[in-house]
A protein has these predicted regions:
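Catalytic/RNA-binding core of pseudouridine synthases
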Residues: 1-153
Length: 153
């Protein structure tokens, strides 16, 4: 889920909002026009708060030390991007995204905000699939602990 109209240095809730932007011009029609432009191959600059290595050091460590470095854009693929819900009052946008390995959804939030001539950051993320493993095929934490307890007995 994206919060439109504000950005953070980490592109998510890890850091406080550092800037706010107009949202009066953002409508469902504009979102429906902009979102499909993200399907296909995209060049994406990773967030500073990421595990990408810069001269052998993790970018997030450098960012936490206050150092700014230029990260190189990486080619990725967004196979599908679908609008699930847009709350015009709260300026929150929920999407379903099928993407390639290495895609930073936080950076995608940033890029969507920019294309909407505003800002955006990620406020919620739920992975529903990693490779061939789908959330529907998984067990809950409670089910896991029950299995472990039964194995120990």
């Amino acid at each position: 889920m994206l919060q439109l109209g504000a950005t953070t240095p980490s592109f998510d809730l890890e850091k406080e909002i550092d800037a706010t932007y107009p949202t009066e011009h953002i409508s469902r029609a504009l979102i429906e026009e902009v979102i499909p432009t993200f399907e296909g191959e995209q060049w994406q600059v990773p967030p500073m708060f990421s595990a990408v290595k810069v001269d052998g050091k993790r970018a997030y460590k450098l960012a936490r030390q206050g150092e700014e470095v230029e990260l190189k854009a990486k080619l990725l693929v967004i196979d599908e991007i679908e609008i699930l819900r847009f709350d015009e009052e709260k300026m929150q946008l929920e999407l379903r995204i099928v993407c390639s390995k290495g895609t930073y959804i936080r950076a995608l939030a940033r890029d969507i905000g920019l294309r909407l001539n505003s800002g955006a950051h990620l406020i919620a993320l739920r992975r529903t699939r990693v490779g061939d493993i789908c959330v529907e095929d998984c067990i809950t934490f409670e089910q896991f602990t029950t299995l472990i307890d039964n194995e120990i007995k």
